């Protein structure tokens, strides 16, 4: 028979545990900034926006080439156009790297030793560069798009979506210590 204990404050359960793990583990509520109820849908939407941006890059090139439509962008607009897609690709690669690392760590308890520490360090350093750099590129891209007089409202809206996506990825990276420079997990 299992016994469960809970701490109740003002009629709400704020933490609980059960007999087998009670001496060393207690389940607390997640803080608002780590709550997966709103973070996971936002993360999925953010990664989807970045994935669409990356996948539609070659599609737009093929369509323009097929119908002979030139890409009429100034030099800075072209750089922003390319850099936001590269930043999106790198962000997706980093997310996949973290998923693979967590899967490897979950596969065997032997992987929770120092065996995977170099990979954790590598991903933490790369996450700092990619997530912060991705937000900087997204902000620059949005600034360039909003400054352009000939840009359509869809491009302006999508630039804001990409800024929110980059901010979300950086927020999750900071909240869940993907950018922490430590292997204390």
Predicted regions mapped to residue ranges:
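Peripheral terminal and inter-domain segments
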Residues: 1-185
